[in-house]
Every structure is written in structure tokens, then in C-alpha cells.
């Protein structure tokens, strides 16, 4: 089957925003207007097409990124609708990794919110061009100019309206297109695409002023436009559109549109903007990877190049089994083809190729550069792996994911569910790189760890619904870590003689702090005092010992271990003896390395009416919070603070009580910090 849409006529975009800004409703309207669905489902009714998981429909939030494909004006638009809740930020990150551009949705009344800043930062990391849709213009308190101001102030970007609203709140009736200087009126019916009307006389001067501001702003980024502007020549819609596209693709300019997705106002114009201003795969830089010799390899966005793709998501489908979502950067692939997983060095066979629409699917036989699809049948491929044509060695840059910060113990209610639970949790961990499963060696309990209480709530619900496993959980625990703060040299010597062959392993290690770099092992042995074949055993012995901690049994992080001396016995030395000797040397750091316990510190932002600011600040301070910033937003005050996670359990209830239910808060991981001495002593006491 030949390619249906050229690369120039393809768009790969994400819908990103703070929770409740209207991302999923916006996506639903896009699907309706492009003919992908024929009945609009509402998020608040639990009938959204894109929020297909039961938990999403019940809670009215997006939990997992959902992919779909729509068609508009001879273009194929691949869309990924992403979550807005901070616990599911990883879904945004891995989606943006494979997308070429994004629509950022913001609330016209709230403007830029905390999670808007997070997803914007993620999109900036991936250099994704964006257009901005100021949604909910019909909402009480909607203020387009305020929303645009927050974009420039809080995000520090060059955002400029290319549309202007006609009215606001209940009086929001239409938009003015500043590029063409035409106006459109909406009656709110689902089929309404906007009726052309003359620009209202009360807004004629405003429209001309805002168009001039748009031209002036763009002229600093576009030479052709600058010459026309300086010579005071008329600037046509075509010239202006071309300048907007060019600056948007460079991510130096962000066009701002407006509307109300729920009331079907402005969505069609946003679809036009996606096609007009966001990049095609051939507009972005060729993908760069490395080969087995660490040399750079470039792949052009072309069907003629060798097949190169990135797996960005794994999920289990109840009907077809394990699905691997991937983006093709170069070349083409057929169902049934053999490909090479260059990250893991394994061969894989593509089963069925599927074009996804949320959780429904359409089978295709062939896929091309620029396509985003799912495939059935990959056995060992996980998120971040590179897939390439056989014989190719290119490895693309993978993805980095944050460490979990909260954990709970899980116990099945029946013995029969014990094995089933292990398999189910492994499947869920395969899907979600920020979810971890491990065993507590002291208690034998199964521990699950994630990004927040909601994250783990969803995992437990999925365990119950999808895998039919009933389980009990403990109260959430903080995922503490340990590290050393002082360089030290320690000896580990393991000798055992019990008739016949004995055991002998002996190492001298240098341990030093390695802030932010994780575990690093260096072999500095000279002269063979520790034979080469035992060095991997030394490294493994230390790595295994790191998991058990030295102060309170929490994993040790950010440590550099250098093997510099030791000895061996011709007969009695073994890998096991050197593993044990290495772990003994690590335990010595308890007295010599000045070890400390690290706790997760959270960025907390509380938005509260002015009347309750004192209550909120007092409470945050009592939780060992450090106030960072305070700013006025619309009719409220936003308070930013750094607070230890251990102090934040149950905060939602207390905040509700302190502010009569009128404040909201958002919390996300910031960093790990050393615990105060009194807290350290308390933690060690509890663990012992």
C-alpha cells in the first residue's frame, strides 16, 4: 500500500496543559469536526472518547496519553492527548519526545498555572514549536489579555495573539482573525464552524491596533516583513501567515488563539492553525543517533532511509496483548518484518501494525517515516528503545524519567493471588517507567513506588479491575534515600575455612560522594592484585549492598566506588567471596563516610483567596516549609514553597479546613535533601 499522505501533509502534535484547562474536550471537538467521531463525548459525563480507561471516565481526568489520527484539509494529523495531573507528567514527557509540535491549552480565567509551566518546560527541552489556545472564554472571569500576559510573564516567552475575542464570559460570541482581519460568529451548535461577519465597529480600532502589534512583533524575527513594515507598505495575509509559520517553526514565536471548546467556538480555526503553523516531520531537524563506536549517525526524515524508530510507550490491551507504540523517524516497515532492537541488541518481529484511536484500532500493512503507530508482538522492547532495520546499529537518545518519591506495601488478600499479583505488577511496571516494584528483604513485603498518592491509587484500581486481584495496602511511606558525605577508604576481607576448599576475597575500596550522578564504579587495580575476572563480582557486590543501605536500610545513591587494592588466593578465591568482601567494605562507610538520610522535597503551590493567606503560610511553615515566592493571580494569591514530602500527607484535608474549601494546591517533586538530625534519629529509631 503506497503512502497516502506526503510528509509535508503530515502533522504529529500533542495537546498539553494544566489539569482542567480543557485538553481532552478540545481533542474531542477536533475529532468531531474532522469527522473522526460523530457524537461528542464530555469529560465531565465520563463519555470522552480519548479518556477510555474506566478510572479516567469516573474521575474526569486524563491518566494515560491517548493517540488518535484525524484528517483536515488534505492533511493527516496524528494527535496525542496527554494528562495534566502532576503525577502523570511522564506521559507528557514521552509523548513530546516523539512529537513535532504541540497545542498548549490554557484557561482564560486562570492563565498559566503550575502544571502549564511544567509541560511548557518539557516541550522546550524537546524544542517543540507550539501554538497556544486560550480556552474557556465563556467562563465567568475569563480575561484574554490577562491570560496572554501570564504567558509572557510566567513562561518568559514571545507569545502574541493572532486572534482577538469578541466579548468574554456569557458575551463571548466570536473571534477576529488578526491575520486576515475577518470576524467569525458562533451560535454554539456542535456543527458550527463559524459564520463570517463584519468586525464589530466597537472592535475595529482594537483589531487594527492588535494586527499592527503582531506585525511589529514578527518584524524583529523576519527580514522580509521588517522591510515591508519599515517602508510602510501594506502587508497581505499570505506574507503575514508565512512569517508566523517561519517564526513558530523556530520556536521563537508562539501564536495565541482563543475560543471555548465546550461551546464549539474557535476549534475549527485552531485546526487551521495546526495545519498552517505547526511543523511537518520534514520541517524538523533530521534525527541523530550513535553507532556501536559512539560515532554520530544522522537519519533524514525520508522513506528512502534505513528504517529507524523509537518505542515511546508500552501498554497491555485486553484484546491483542502487549502493544508497543513507536514513532518512525526514517524509512518504512511492513507488518511481519524482522527489525533489530539496537538498544538491547536483540531481534524482534513486527506482528500486526495498528493505527490507534484511543483504545480502538485499525490494522495497516505498511508504515512510513513520520508515522506514529502501535505494533503487536514485540517481546523485549521497552520505553526508550531504538528499533532499526536489520544490519543497522543506530541508537537514538533514550528518555530520562524521574525517580518515584512515595511507596506503599501491597499484600494480596488470598494466597492464590500472590503469583498473579507479581505478574500483574510487572506488567504495569513495564508500561510505566515511573512505577517501581521491589521486595523488602527484611519483611518480605512487596513494595510499590510511584510519583504520588493518586498515581498509586490508580495502580491499585487497575490491579483490581484489569487483573481481578484484591489486595490490602499500608499507609503511604516516603521513599527516603541514603548517601555518604565524606570520602573514605575501607577494607573488606572475607575468609572462610570449613574443611576442603575455603573462601577468600579481599578488597580495598575508596568511596566518595557523587552528587546527582548516581552510582559509579572505577577499577584502578594494577599488577593483578585482584584478578580481572573478579572485578565484575566486586562491582555487583557493591551494587547489591547499595539497595540495603547503611543507616536505616534505604537505598544508597550518588556514590562513587573505586577498587584500588586487594589480594586473592589461588585456590580459595571465588566470585562469591569477592562479592561478600565488596559488600563488607561498603558497610564500613557507616562509621567512616559520614552517611546521611535524604528526603524528597516537593515544590508546593497553593492558590488561595487573600483572606486565608496567613493560615496557609502558618501551616506550611509548621510543616518545615520554606517560602519561595508569593504573587497575585486574578482574585487570589499564589504561594510557592519547598516542603518535605513526609510533612504533606493529609494536607488536602487540612487546607480545605483552613480555607473553607476555597484554596487549591499542586505538588511535584523538586529534589532530595539531607534530613535534619532530629528527623534522621527518628527515622533510624522507627526502622530499627
From Swiss-Prot:
Keyword terms of this UniProt record: Cytoplasm, Elongation factor, GTP-binding, Nucleotide-binding, Protein biosynthesis
Cell location: Cytoplasm
One Gene Ontology term, aspect cellular component: cytoplasm
Domain of life from the UniProt record: Bacteria
SMART domains the UniProt entry points to: EFG_C, EFG_IV
One GO term (biological process): ribosome disassembly
Any one Pfam family match given in the protein's UniProt record, by short name: EFG_IV
Main localization category: cytoplasm
Described purpose of this protein according to its UniProt entry: Catalyzes the GTP-dependent ribosomal translocation step during translation elongation. During this step, the ribosome changes from the pre-translocational (PRE) to the post-translocational (POST) state as the newly formed A-site-bound peptidyl-tRNA and P-site-bound deacylated tRNA move to the P and E sites, respectively. Catalyzes the coordinated movement of the two tRNA molecules, the mRNA and conformational changes in the ribosome.
Protein known as: Elongation factor G
Biological source species: Phytoplasma australiense
Gene: fusA
Amino acid at each position: 500500500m503506497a503512502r497516502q499522505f506526503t510528509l509535508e501533509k503530515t502533522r504529529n502534535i500533542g495537546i498539553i496543559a494544566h489539569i482542567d484547562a480543557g485538553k481532552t474536550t478540545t481533542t474531542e471537538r477536533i475529532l468531531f469536526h474532522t469527522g473522526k467521531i460523530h457524537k461528542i463525548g464530555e469529560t465531565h459525563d465520563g463519555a470522552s472518547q480519548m479518556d477510555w480507561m474506566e478510572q479516567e471516565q469516573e474521575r474526569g481526568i486524563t491518566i494515560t496519553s491517548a493517540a488518535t489520527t484525524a484528517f483536515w484539509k488534505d492533511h493527516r494529523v496524528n494527535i496525542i492527548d496527554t494528562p495534566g495531573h502532576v503525577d502523570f507528567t511522564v506521559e507528557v514527557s514521552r509523548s513530546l519526545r516523539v512529537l513535532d509540535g504541540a497545542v498548549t491549552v490554557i484557561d482564560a480565567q486562570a492563565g498559566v498555572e503550575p502544571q502549564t509551566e511544567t509541560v511548557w518546560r518539557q516541550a522546550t527541552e524537546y524544542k517543540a514549536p507550539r501554538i497556544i489556545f486560550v480556552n474557556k472564554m465563556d467562563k465567568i472571569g475569563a480575561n484574554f489579555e490577562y491570560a496572554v500576559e501570564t504567558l509572557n510573564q510566567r513562561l518568559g516567552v514571545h507569545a502574541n495573539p493572532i486572534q482577538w475575542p469578541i466579548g468574554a464570559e456569557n458575551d463571548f460570541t466570536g473571534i477576529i482573525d488578526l491575520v486576515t482581519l475577518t470576524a467569525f460568529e458562533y451560535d454554539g451548535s456542535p456543527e458550527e464552524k463559524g459564520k463570517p461577519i463584519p468586525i464589530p465597529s466597537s472592535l475595529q480600532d482594537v483589531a487594527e491596533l492588535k494586527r499592527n502589534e503582531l506585525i511589529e512583533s514578527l518584524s524583529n524575527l523576519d527580514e522580509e516583513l521588517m522591510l515591508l513594515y519599515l517602508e510602510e507598505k501594506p502587508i497581505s495575509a499570505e506574507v503575514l501567515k508565512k512569517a508566523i509559520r517561519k517564526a513558530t517553526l523556530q520556536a521563537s514565536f508562539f501564536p495565541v488563539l482563543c475560543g471555548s471548546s465546550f461551546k464549539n467556538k474557535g476549534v475549527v480555526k485552531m485546526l487551521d492553525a495546526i495545519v498552517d503553523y505547526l511543523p511537518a516531520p520534514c520541517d524538523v531537524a533530521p534525527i541523530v543517533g550513535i553507532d556501536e563506536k559512539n560515532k554520530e549517525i544522522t537519519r533524514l526524515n525520508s522513506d528512502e532511509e534505513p528504517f529507524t524508530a523509537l518505542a515511546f510507550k508500552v501498554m497491555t490491551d485486553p484484546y491483542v496483548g502487549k502493544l508497543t507504540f513507536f514513532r518512525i523517524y526514517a524509512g518504512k516497515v511492513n507488518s511481519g518484518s524482522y527489525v533489530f532492537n539496537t538498544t538491547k541488541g536483540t531481534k524482534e518481529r513486527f506482528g500486526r501494525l495498528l493505527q490507534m484511536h484511543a483504545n480502538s484500532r485499525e490494522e495497516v500493512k505498511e508504515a512510513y517515516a513520520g508515522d506514529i503507530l502501535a505494533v503487536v508482538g514485540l517481546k523485549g522492547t521497552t520505553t526508550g528503545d531504538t528499533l532499526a532495520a536489520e544490519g543497522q546499529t543506530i541508537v537514538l537518545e533514550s528518555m530520562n524519567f524521574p525517580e518515584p518519591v512515595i511507596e506503599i506495601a501491597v499484600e494480596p488478600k488470598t494466597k492464590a493471588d500472590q503469583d498473579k499479583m507479581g505478574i500483574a505488577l510487572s506488567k504495569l511496571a513495564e508500561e510505566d517507567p515511573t512505577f517501581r516494584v521491589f521486595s523488602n528483604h527484611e519483611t518480605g513485603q512487596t513494595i510499590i513506588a510511584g510519583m504520588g498518592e493518586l498515581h498509586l491509587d490508580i495502580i491499585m484500581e487497575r490491579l483490581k479491575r484489569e487483573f481481578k486481584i484484591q489486595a490490602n495496602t499500608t499507609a503511604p511511606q516516603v521513599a527516603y534515600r541514603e548517601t555518604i558525605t565524606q570520602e573514605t577508604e575501607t577494607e573488606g576481607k572475607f575468609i572462610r575455612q570449613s574443611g576442603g576448599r575455603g573462601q577468600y576475597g579481599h578488597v580495598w575500596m575508596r568511596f566518595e560522594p557523587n552528587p546527582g550522578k548516581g552510582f559509579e564504579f572505577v577499577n584502578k587495580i594494577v599488577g593483578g592484585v585482584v584478578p580481572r575476572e573478579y572485578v565484575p563480582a566486586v562491582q555487583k557486590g557493591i551494587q547489591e549492598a547499595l539497595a540495603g543501605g547503611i543507616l536505616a536500610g534505604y537505598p544508597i545513591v550518588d556514590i562513587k566506588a573505586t577498587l584500588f587494592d586487594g589480594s586473592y588466593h589461588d585456590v580459595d578465591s571465588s566470585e562469591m567471596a569477592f562479592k561478600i568482601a565488596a559488600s563488607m567494605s561498603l558497610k564500613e562507610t557507616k562509621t567512616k563516610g559520614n552517611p546521611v538520610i535524604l528526603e524528597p522535597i516537593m515544590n508546593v503551590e497553593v492558590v488561595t483567596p487573600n483572606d486565608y493567606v496567613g493560615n496557609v503560610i502558618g501551616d506550611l511553615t509548621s510543616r518545615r516549609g520554606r517560602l519561595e515566592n508569593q504573587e497575585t493571580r486574578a482574585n487570589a494569591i499564589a504561594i510557592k514553597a519547598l516542603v518535605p514530602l513526609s510533612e504533606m500527607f493529609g494536607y488536602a484535608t487540612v487546607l480545605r479546613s483552613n480555607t473553607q474549601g476555597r484554596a487549591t494546591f499542586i505538588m511535584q517533586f523538586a529534589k532530595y535533601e539531607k534530613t535534619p538530625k532530629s528527623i534522621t534519629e527518628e527515622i533510624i529509631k522507627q526502622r530499627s
